[in-house]
Amino acid sequence: MCTLFKRQVEHRPVEQILINTSREETRVAILDDGLLQDLFIERACARGLVGNVYWGQVVRVLPGMQSAFLDVGLERTAFLHIAEIEGARMDTGTFKPIESLLHEGQRLMVQVAKDPIGTKGARLTTTISLAGRKLVYLPNDSHIGVSQRIEDAALREELRTLATTVRQKDEKGGYIVRTCAEEGATEQEFLSDMAYLARLWDGIRHRAQEVKKPTLLYQDLTLAQRTLRDMVHEGCLLYTSPSPRDRSVSRMPSSA
């Protein structure tokens, strides 16, 4: 395994991650040197929808609002604006008329970008993105980018070069290097992410071919699973009660 880089830090607080799961809720506490820094709670009855991928059907197109409502199998129809439709923006910067892209009864794959609020349904996008540990996969794009939160220009170029080198020449889709790669990234970590995300996307596509009506194709990871993916790193102390890892590992990159 060849490490691209590893930042040196003179003193790094001992980080502790505590995960407590029950049927009702999951609680995650982040501590630095024993001091609470963050507390996250996810209730089973109110789990968010952001990141979920659905097979939806257009039920109404509104040219005046340049938007559409889709049935995705939820209690309320979901909202899709023209700006969230891939391929809708023209070279001039303006958008194609939504009625030229969508029609009632049309079926398409969408992802939740914003949870329902009050009487408003979920907001959708057709730009599908799937997150791994170090990379975000964009199956309908070919671009390789780097998180804008990584500001070091030289580091950004190193990460982009690594992702470009590792990606298979005939591989479809693009990637965005996640902010967490700023602390260190290896070729093997990128390869592991790419393999995991390719399997995940294949599963979603195959399910979309099988379903006959609007339905959920992929549910995003739970709070416990996201914590294992995003926050656990070398040197941190992890405490779980009970352990969520056995239930999570099948949906995580092999490097997790």
Give the label of every model feature segment.
Residues 1-241, 251:
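Single-stranded RNA-binding surfaces
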